[in-house]
């Protein structure tokens, strides 16, 4: 008969996968306060004997964190309390179930890597401890120990099969998480593409907004120039109207002077007529005086004729001046209306310029926001990639653990078969 495989009972044997490094991760399922852990274990094991509870507390507070170095303390406690190995294993399993399902004393659901690490560490510990207990019992009790060892091996086989089922479920959940991660990554990629399109559109609209702002500024400057020109025209028209009014006043003064000249000509003509009469009375001595009187009369008549011509021209000038004055008044009114319209247009251009500036500022903010969203989506994609890598690592670890557990199950079954044949 071939002897039992020492790798099942010797804690110094190298496991198929490294487990010691997983213990800190396994501890993440447990609360940091020992009293909380103690209360949790007592609550889960309310129907178990006190010495079993004490052994479980010893395992979770000392053995699980410290590994093989603390096996002796737990084995001593098991021996001192005469604790049944099967009852102890069942109690540890009872505590493990709510921890792995997320009903443990810590807040929130457990991380996948913590669940995997905890399951692997406990599986190794239970296998090694059961082997040590079985070996000690065999040395102490002989054939009775062999029977107990067979029962222990059967229990280990059952636990290993349950562990296989758990590993299959964990592997299924890991695969599902990987699929969900891939789907989420695809969704994030679509969102990133949409954000990039929005950013591109915002950039294009922002460029056009800058062009509109430039045009609005140019239009505003042109409107300012038009207003200044209209103001200059209005001032010029007002000045010409004032000058025309002054000219009209001067022509009226000329008209008064012409009337005076006409009066003088009439009086001179009357004096010349009187002089002619007096010269006729004076006979031959008044001939020279008569000639002078005729000359004076001729000059008076010519002066009157010139004065009448001047008066006619002055009247024409006055008519034209009045017409020009009326036209200038109308032109001044029109320039005032144009000035008012130009000022209103200037205000409108200023409002357009302010609105376009506001739109440009808003578009700059949208552009900055989309850039931040793009950065966030890139960071999220990196986080999802990291989560996917961890999920793949967990899946690989679970597969490795399942292989190791399956190999151990085969060894246990072979050991059980050999033990049955040796009886």
Swiss-Prot record:
Pfam family, one: MCPsignal
Chief location: cytoplasm
GO cellular component: cytoplasm; membrane
InterPro entries assigned to the protein according to its UniProt record, in alphabetical order: Chemotax_Me-accpt_rcpt (IPR004090), MCPsignal_dom (IPR004089)
Domain Methyl-accepting transducer: 152-388
One GO term of the biological process aspect: signal transduction
PROSITE patterns: CHEMOTAXIS_TRANSDUC_2
Molecular function GO terms recorded: transmembrane signaling receptor activity
Biased composition (Polar residues): 1-19
Region (Disordered): 1-21
The entry's keywords: Chemotaxis, Cytoplasm, Transducer
PTM note: Methylated by CheR.
Cleavable signal peptide: none
Domain of life: Archaea
Localization terms from the record: Cytoplasm
Family: Belongs to the methyl-accepting chemotaxis (MCP) protein family.
Job of this protein: Potentially involved in chemo- or phototactic signal transduction.
Protein name: Transducer protein Htr13
Organism listed in the record: Halobacterium salinarum (strain ATCC 29341 / DSM 671 / R1)
Protein encoded by which gene: htr13
